[in-house]
Amino acid sequence: SGYTEALTDPSFKGQILMSTYPLEGNYGVSEEWYQSDKVQVEGFVVREACKKLSNFGTKKTLDDFLKEFKVPGIEDIDTRDLTLKIREKGSLKAALATEEIDDDELVARAQEHKSIIDLDLVPLVSTPELKTFGDFDKTVAILDCGVKKNIINCFLENDIGVALFPYDTDYQTILDYGVNGLMVSPGPGNPERLTETIANVEKLLNRFPIFGICMGQHVIAKTFGGIKKKS
């Protein structure tokens, strides 16, 4: 996964993304790499942003890409050092300014912002209505907590259709649709806030194969009374 895929990944909604690789943007940006229809992150932090493309197949720079979606980026940051701090302390509140502002005021704004565990981010990235992909003998339902395009493509490449449901779809609606399995997708934020999704998945247990990726695994674990804990 490259920077284009990461920046358009709905799982990073509500977060400032930082790259540990020292140079980003050298091969440009192409829409074929998008994992959603827009940049999902709130900001991008890099050591150096390449200004000259080294890819004949792209014409859009990383800077152009971020500006297109009005997402701030910052370079000349010691990302290796910052990574060590985040590794020790965990995710930290942060803010990026696009104009002159007092340092203390910017820090205060960041501190006033809600923690990511208290934000409802999944509704911002989930499909608002049912969408279908492919016409095959078997179909998998995906509860869309922030699915990436590549996940859908993997099913289609294996001759499996996809019925993409909003994250809060009632379990009976999924049963009535008649699918062969259920996947709970990745997504941003705190899975414990998805009480409705957890309740619906619990009612679908033992009806057909169920699996999840990232946040989806946490949702399924919650239906069995599991708790999440960082090791």
Go through the PLM ranges and name each one.
Residues 1-172, 176-177, 191:
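RNA-binding accessory domains that recognize and position tRNA/RNA substrates
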Residues 176-231:
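Cysteine-nucleophile active-site neighborhood
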